[in-house]
Amino acid sequence: MSYVIDRRLNGKNKSTVNRQRFLRRYREHIKKAVEEAVSRRSIMDMEHGEQISIPGRDIDEPVLHHGRGGKQTIVHPGNKEFTAGEHIARPQGGGGGGGRGKAGNSGEGMDDFVFQITQEEFLEFMFEDLELPNLVKRHLTGADTFKTVRAGIANEGNPSRINIVRTLRSAHARRIALTGSSRALLREAQKELARLKVEEPDNFTDIQEVEQEIERLKARINRLPFLDTFDLKYNLLVKQPNPSSKAVMFCLMDVSGSMTQATKDIAKRFFILLYLFLKRNYDRIEVVFIRHHTSAREVDEEEFFYSRETGGTIVSSALKMMQEIMAERYPASDWNIYAAQASDGDNWNDDSPICREILSKQIMPHVQYYTYVEITPREHQALWYEYERIGEAFPDTFAQQQLVSAGDIYPVFRELFQRRLAT
């Protein structure tokens, strides 16, 4: 039986290249549709594909044709209604389109072209041109650590790693292959010798010749070595990179009593989008979740998004905890440190200057990028204005934006993490 091994990268999906070419050609249409989908979807529902509609007029191929100017004289066979010199009116409406117009009895057109993009394609367009700013300290953590793992069988290796079973199996197969014809001749000679001894026991000449042939064949088979260097098989051990994280993102969320349920929902949606962005685009990043009201606490992902704990408001408690964790686990000399903070701006009045002091002296000199989003439809309060002073002192590594509704999340997110041009 014959086997066909398909080693093509696309496998059975032979249209992958054409699909990628199509996505590149209509990138602007798809990107616009993805942005509209993000604005109407729940952030929790981002990991799905999307149905894209492209106007029919935009998928027409360019062709060379005669212009509409000039004069033409055409004779139409069977023409009983018009005479030479009369003008033929254009067909009336009724062309194809979105389907919202009234019915027509003439004209033609083309419906919009609708197709589906996959989850991976949707996320690619969603996070296109986004990145963590100032990611520059990749080399400071030193060489990656490695772990030794089994990687199959090799023909060369350390004698201490010889695989006895595979070696003997290979030697046995080699002997069978190389002595197959000799063994077949030996069996025939042994049958012939048995026949001669029964039927012609006095034919000593032929019996002696057959016995000599048998001895010669046995000697040929025995000359083949039991074990050859070709048979040796070794367990292959390779070093697999076990990379350490190069970057850490601190997520600080205000869960105080001043945060309404709608405000908390917007904050959670923002952090879910951020978490999805980090996990998709960066394999080597750690995320630290900090919730705070009057006191701050480091929590896991589940508790960060779904805990119902609440209380008063002291924002500096979260900043102090972040600074402590940085000093203990993430030295700035080895890590790219990022932070995203979400709050409604309400804070104990005497605490806002403390926040600015902690940020400007203990955090901002060590982070690559710090972003603050304030979720409020009202006028800004003291915390916003204190943070504005931080932005003036650190214009390249600090950014702040305001969120009013859930529809602002994606545009603000793109504004905060838009890819910067190298300077």
From Swiss-Prot:
SUPFAM superfamilies per the UniProt record, alphabetical: vWA-like
What InterPro entries does UniProt report for this protein, alphabetically? Answer: UPF0229, vWFA_dom_sf
Q: Tell me the HAMAP family matching this sequence.
A: UPF0229 (MF_01232)
Q: Where is this region: Disordered?
A: 85-107
Q: Where is the composition biased (Gly residues)?
A: 92-107
Q: Write down a Pfam family by its short name.
A: DUF444
- UniProt-recorded name of the protein: UPF0229 protein PputW619_4806
Q: Kindly list the residue ranges recorded as spanning the membrane.
A: none
Supply the PANTHER family for this chain: UPF0229 PROTEIN YEAH (PTHR30510:SF2)
Entry similarity comment: Belongs to the UPF0229 family.
